[in-house]
């Protein structure tokens, strides 16, 4: 299989194998409306296998969201067919509007329009808790 290089855009590399569609969903990128290439279950020396997402044209992605859903991913910015910048997402201390609280008694569940906000409690376990009711977040 051959996937050619892109001239201008971004490459999200080292996405956990089989999760690229979920990553696109969390990044709010619609595959039906965006020129992109998905390479799934590619060989990786570091991880065994990985997914790669290539997005043509300028697309502003939220590195905090990417750090939350695909912590080990890297982002390469491509201009004129060459990588001009490499970015490494970090695990965010706070996430807003990415996931929803599962607690049926949480104010965010009962009241429409309240932003879903979570804070990092334990970085090794990737544990986030709701700012309002302290319920653990589920990805």
Curated annotation (Swiss-Prot):
GO biological process: 'de novo' pyrimidine nucleobase biosynthetic process; pyrimidine nucleotide biosynthetic process
SUPFAM superfamilies in UniProt: Aspartate carbamoyltransferase, Regulatory-chain, C-terminal domain, Aspartate carbamoyltransferase, Regulatory-chain, N-terminal domain
Textual note on the cofactor: Binds 1 zinc ion per subunit.
A GO term from the CC aspect: aspartate carbamoyltransferase complex
InterPro entries associated with the record: Asp_carbamoyltransf_reg_N (IPR020545), Asp_carbamoylTrfase_reg (IPR002801), Asp_carbamoyltrfase_reg_C (IPR020542), Asp_carbatrfase_reg_C_sf (IPR036792), Asp_carbatrfase_reg_N_sf (IPR036793)
Pfam families xref list: PyrI, PyrI_C
Entry keyword DNA-binding: no
Swiss-Prot/TrEMBL keywords: Metal-binding, Pyrimidine biosynthesis, Zinc
GO molecular function, one term: metal ion binding
Entry binding sites for Zn(2+): 101, 106, 130, 133
Needed co-factor(s): Zn(2+)
Entry coiled-coil feature ranges: none
Source domain of life: Bacteria
Cited PANTHER family: ASPARTATE CARBAMOYLTRANSFERASE REGULATORY CHAIN
Family listed: Belongs to the PyrI family.
Subunit structure of this chain's protein: Contains catalytic and regulatory chains.
Entry function: Involved in allosteric regulation of aspartate carbamoyltransferase.
Name by which UniProt lists this protein: Aspartate carbamoyltransferase regulatory chain
Protein source organism: Bifidobacterium longum (strain NCC 2705)
Gene that encodes it: pyrI
